Regions:
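Short, well-structured alpha-helical segments
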Residues: 52-55, 80, 93-98
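C-terminal cap of thioredoxin/glutaredoxin-like
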Residues: 84-183
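A short, hydrophobic secondary-structure junction motif
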Residues: 41, 60-65, 80-87, 138-140
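Structural alpha/beta surface segment adjacent to cysteine/selenocysteine redox centers
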Residues: 2-72
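Mid-domain, small-residue-enriched loop/turn segments at the edges of structured enzyme/sensor domains
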Residues: 72-77, 81
Length: 183
């Protein structure tokens, strides 16, 4: 919700990179299906809030399917339900999770390119998820633990914006469009 408010107020531009490198941690190609659906939604639903809400829904703690031996299969109907819950029309949601996976080649190519970009590597020199950059600078999420803060508060501090300024048009982050994260 915070990112959507920032985006809608023109305080933030968001670049999303959907990746499928976690497929091996599920028994049913979860990453391929969930992000093929996201791409379909992005291409067929004109409201970016719907896509962002869908992504929020699938990353919600009570929806995460686990990994490896803790993985619980998630069928396409459950993914479709999360899309509709996010405001996506039933027709678009049904097509997004029809099983066709028409964006799989694109998703795989994007994945293979993105995970090899050195500017996205963590402090250990490898790609990890989630990865966030601020004005092209890698933002180390481990610093949140060291600072004893949550992701939203840490992010707002890093861009130089107070919580009461979130979603307020004209109130821009103090780092501007080219500054490095503050923390």
């Amino acid at each position: 919700p915070t990112l959507v408010k920032l985006m809608n107020a023109g305080q933030l531009n968001i670049d999303l990179h959907f990746l499928n490198f976690q497929n091996n941690k599920s028994s049913d190609n979860y990453s391929n299906r969930v992000f093929n659906g996201a791409i379909y939604i992005a291409e067929h639903d004109d409201d970016p809030d719907h896509l962002m809400s869908y992504l929020s829904n699938i990353y919600a703690e009570d929806f995460q399917p686990g990994e490896l031996s803790n993985y619980e299969p998630v069928n396409n109907a459950k993914l479709e339900k999360q899309a509709v819950k996010a405001g996506v029309s039933e027709d678009v949601a049904a097509a997004a999770f029809s099983g066709k996976n028409e964006y799989l080649d694109w998703l795989t190519a994007s994945n293979n390119y993105t995970i090899l970009r050195p500017e996205l590597f963590n402090s250990s020199g490898a790609f990890s998820s989630p990865t966030l950059t601020i004005n092209g600078e890698y933002w180390d999420l481990k610093q949140l633990t060291l600072a004893d803060t949550n992701m939203v508060d840490g992010f707002l501090k890093s861009i130089g914006l107070d919580a009461d300024q979130v979603g307020v048009e004209g109130k821009m982050p103090s780092i501007g469009a080219s500054g490095k994260p503050i923390s």
